[in-house]
């Protein structure tokens, strides 16, 4: 692969195609915040605002401002979204709602812990860009609330009957791996080291299962044992692979090459397991025993799964020189650019059927916003840049 050309391809796609799309199409100039329900051309088809996606867009533009270029336009975009979130996104005690209407009235109660994690990321990154102490405080206080909710993330909003089947889920420790590095500048060093070790332990010792051939499961019993239930058999290959680049970043930060190596091997294991050998692409959901999955969309091909996989593969190659990572990167790169990039209009499709045909031609919705595509393009660009410097 021509790394010089690839570096340019990812950088240009980010800065000339994807970012201008969100800058132009997503900002609500009337009420603040962002529209994320955007059709193929970028027209708004629903005005509700989802806290995950509002916060992710604040984070993304803050991150670009901090790491790529001090463009005022990017900072202004992040600040206006953050001010909307600060005013309307929570109940006054930093319990973050799931969704709001266009004006900022709450629609869905604060049942979802990931509203909190993305708010922490957003205000943490923006506080670095602005040196604004209020933003830093919001990030730190929200992070404290997340830690207090770790054992029971949904709290009073949980539908599960207490005590019958207590499962713990992979998503929170996985996100905390990323969050620990994201807001490290705001926290005490001794606390951060402990938090990092705890996350690594959960991801690599609890959810990664050597007895299943080294795959990562989404749910285990609270005592760490496997559960032979829909939830306990549930696999999400993209989630597991995304977590592995967080672990690689932690391995680099903590100078632990053996951890990086394990994350690389797990990436390859999950990719071999999750790749659709008939049509190409990575399955959305699987069942570890090969039973019929609960989710009807199990065989769809989703944008974020493939983009996160590209990040893990190129980081794995850059950090270890593993040739299998590079071979897979080429294969996943070709599939992703061929199937998800819209050849006529800006931004990428999110949802394909199993055969790789466009299922929904939207560019944003309730779950797809200004996050996985631009973050992925940025991460791959910067990793390939390192490879080019190494050469």
Language-model-derived ranges and their functions:
Residues 1-391:
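Glycan-recognition and catalytic cores of secretory/periplasmic carbohydrate-active enzymes
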């Amino acid at each position: 692969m021509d790394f010089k050309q690839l570096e340019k391809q990812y950088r240009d796609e980010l800065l000339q195609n994807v970012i201008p799309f969100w800058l132009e199409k997503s900002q609500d100039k009337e009420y603040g915040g962002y529209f994320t329900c955007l059709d193929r051309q970028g027209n708004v088809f629903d005005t509700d605002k989802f806290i995950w996606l509002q916060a992710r867009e604040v984070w993304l533009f803050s991150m670009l401002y901090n790491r790529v270029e001090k463009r005022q336009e990017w900072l202004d975009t992040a600040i206006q979204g953050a001010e909307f979130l600060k005013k309307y996104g929570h109940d006054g005690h930093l319990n973050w709602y799931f969704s709001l209407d266009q004006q900022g009235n709450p629609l869905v109660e604060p049942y979802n812990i990931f509203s909190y994690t993305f708010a922490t990321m957003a205000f943490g990154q923006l506080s670095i860009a602005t040196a604004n102490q209020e933003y830093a405080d919001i990030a730190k206080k929200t992070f404290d609330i997340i830690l207090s909710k770790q054992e029971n993330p949904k709290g009073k909003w949980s539908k599960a009957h207490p005590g019958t089947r207590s499962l713990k889920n992979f998503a929170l420790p996985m996100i905390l791996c990323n969050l620990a590095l994201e807001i490290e500048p705001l926290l005490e060093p001794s606390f951060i080291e402990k938090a990092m070790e705890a996350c690594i332990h959960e991801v690599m010792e609890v959810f990664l299962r050597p007895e299943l051939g080294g795959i990562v499961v989404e749910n285990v019993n609270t005592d760490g044992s496997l559960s032979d239930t829909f939830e306990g058999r549930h696999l999400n290959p993209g989630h597991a692979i995304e977590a592995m680049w967080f672990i690689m970043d932690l391995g680099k930060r903590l100078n632990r090459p053996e951890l990086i190596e394990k994350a690389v091997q797990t990436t390859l294991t999950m990719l071999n397991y999750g790749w659709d050998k008939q049509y190409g692409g990575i399955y959305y959901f699987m069942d570890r025993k090969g039973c019929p999955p609960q989710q009807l969309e199990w065989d769809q091909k989703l944008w974020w799964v493939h983009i996160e996989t590209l990040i893990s593969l190129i980081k794995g190659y850059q950090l270890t020189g593993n040739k299998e990572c590079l071979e897979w990167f080429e294969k996943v790169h070709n599939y992703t650019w061929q199937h998800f990039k819209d050849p006529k209009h800006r931004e990428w499709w999110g949802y394909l059927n199993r055969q790789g045909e466009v299922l929904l031609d939207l560019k944003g919705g309730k779950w797809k916003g200004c996050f996985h595509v631009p973050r992925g393009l940025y991460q791959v660009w910067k990793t390939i840049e390192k490879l080019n410097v190494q050469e």
